[in-house]
Amino acid sequence: MRIELNRQPEDIPGETLSIREILKYKNYSFPNLVVRINGKLVKKTDYDTAQVWEGDVVEIIHLISGG
């Protein structure tokens, strides 16, 4: 399926995937993430149930603190 991931086109195998599956596919392991699908925030507790479909716009932002 083709989606927009962090403002870049991305081809990911499958017809639909959960956020958790996309994080695993992309090897994202940061503990503090902000995820949006088509502009809607996804709670961490919903990563297994929030589905991404063909044409969706997904943003995954890792929160990093520094000084």
Where are these regions (language model features)?
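Ubiquitin-like/PB1-type beta-grasp interaction modules and other compact soluble beta-rich domains
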Residues: 1-66
